């Protein structure tokens, strides 16, 4: 019996690089050694990308996961007939593409909710195309949260052996600092610990990054560490969380990459993003925690400027599928 996890891959915005990186990734036999991938998309669009990606593959249009072959050389696609492929102009914002991209995701979510697939590995969508289609979301995370009735999903990056969580995300630095309260640090460490537990990570050693130079150096360069961050860490430790810090941001990610910590809690968006993407831009993969299913995602956009040219790297998509396959057997929904 084939026990490899079934990974659903929504095709993304048809006018972006989603279809071609999907084809390119599934042209790698090693992916089929660890996963059973099934695409949710439009078979004609994938077929159009075969010569672009120089892929000698067959497109198997299906209506249910049970019909999938899960064999290298064949791309199984749950074909949604929701797109006029002849009118798709690569690299442009189009309402039909935004609508189709949303419908691929919605279908994948339903499959996950029905336990037909073990995880989602998502490809890029475009905010402007969604808006043109009057789809009321700005991105995947908000969409998935609403479709699953999940409040405040938690984002984690993984690159090589390093995991990074984010205390704040899309805020100005000034506003992010205002959010760095001891209560928030405490709450997020509890949530991060639960997230890793759900992924099957047994040992969970956390480091919290510092905000100021040298983590403030006892108030010499700022009091945020003394007044908020350290007290928040201490509250988490009282609840049994294995956490240290604040550790100066110029060294904490280096130590995590070398195995001293199992995860870092980054305080603001760019602090963690820079660390991850300087380590390996293409292999930085996002995991959305807090959903009722496992979801991994490439951490790049639709790349309209190169879409349809066959030059987009497939490395991130490959890593996205591999990471979903890595964690899916251990993922706990409760």
Curated annotation (Swiss-Prot):
Keywords: Carbohydrate metabolism, Metal-binding, NAD, Oxidoreductase
One Gene Ontology molecular-function label: NAD binding
Binding site for a divalent metal cation: 170, 214, 269
Cofactor note: Binds 1 divalent metal cation per subunit.
Cofactor list: a divalent metal cation
Binding annotation for substrate: 140-141, 277, 295
Source taxon at top rank: Bacteria
EC number(s) recorded for this UniProt protein: 1.1.1.408
Reactions it catalyzes: 4-O-phospho-D-threonate + NAD(+) = dihydroxyacetone phosphate + CO2 + NADH
Enzyme class: oxidoreductase
Coiled coil: none
Signal peptide: none
Function: Catalyzes the NAD-dependent oxidation and subsequent decarboxylation of D-threonate 4-phosphate to produce dihydroxyacetone phosphate (DHAP).
Family of the protein in this entry: Belongs to the PdxA family. PdxA2 subfamily.
Assembly and binders: Homodimer.
Protein name per Swiss-Prot or TrEMBL: Putative D-threonate 4-phosphate dehydrogenase
Gene: pdxA
């Amino acid at each position: 019996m084939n026990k490899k996890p079934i990974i659903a891959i929504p095709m993304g915005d048809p006018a972006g690089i989603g279809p071609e990186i999907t084809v390119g990734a599934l042209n790698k036999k090693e992916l089929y050694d660890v996963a059973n991938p099934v695409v949710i998309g439009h078979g004609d669009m994938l077929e159009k990308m075969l010569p672009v990606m120089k892929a000698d593959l067959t497109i198997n249009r299906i209506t249910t996961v049970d019909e999938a072959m899960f064999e290298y050389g064949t791309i199984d696609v749950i074909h949604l007939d929701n797109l006029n492929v002849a009118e798709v102009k690569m690299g442009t914002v189009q309402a039909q593409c935004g609508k189709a991209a949303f419908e691929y995701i919605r279908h994948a979510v339903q499959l996950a909710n029905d336990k037909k697939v073990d995880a989602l590995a998502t490809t890029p969508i475009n905010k402007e195309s969604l808006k043109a289609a009057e789809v009321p979301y700005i991105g995947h995370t908000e969409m998935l949260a609403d479709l699953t009735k999940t409040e405040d999903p938690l984002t984690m990056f993984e690159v090589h052996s390093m995991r990074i969580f984010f205390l704040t995300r899309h805020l100005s630095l000034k506003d992010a600092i205002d959010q760095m309260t001891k209560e928030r640090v405490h709450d997020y460490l509890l949530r991060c610990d639960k997230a890793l537990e759900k992924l099957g990570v047994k040992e969970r050693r956390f480091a919290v990054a510092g905000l100021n130079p040298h983590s403030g150096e006892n108030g010499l360069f700022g009091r945020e560490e003394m007044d908020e961050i350290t007290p928040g860490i201490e509250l988490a430790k009282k609840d049994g969380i294995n956490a240290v810090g604040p550790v100066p941001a110029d060294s904490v990610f280096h130590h995590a990459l070398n195995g001293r910590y199992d995860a870092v809690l980054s305080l603001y968006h760019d602090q963690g993003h820079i660390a991850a993407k300087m380590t390996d831009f293409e292999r930085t993969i996002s995991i959305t925690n807090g959903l009722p299913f496992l979801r991994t995602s490439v951490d790049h956009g639709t790349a309209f400027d190169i879409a349809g040219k066959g030059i987009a790297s497939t490395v991130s998509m490959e890593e996205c599928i591999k990471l979903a396959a890595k964690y899916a057997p251990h993922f706990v929904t409760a």
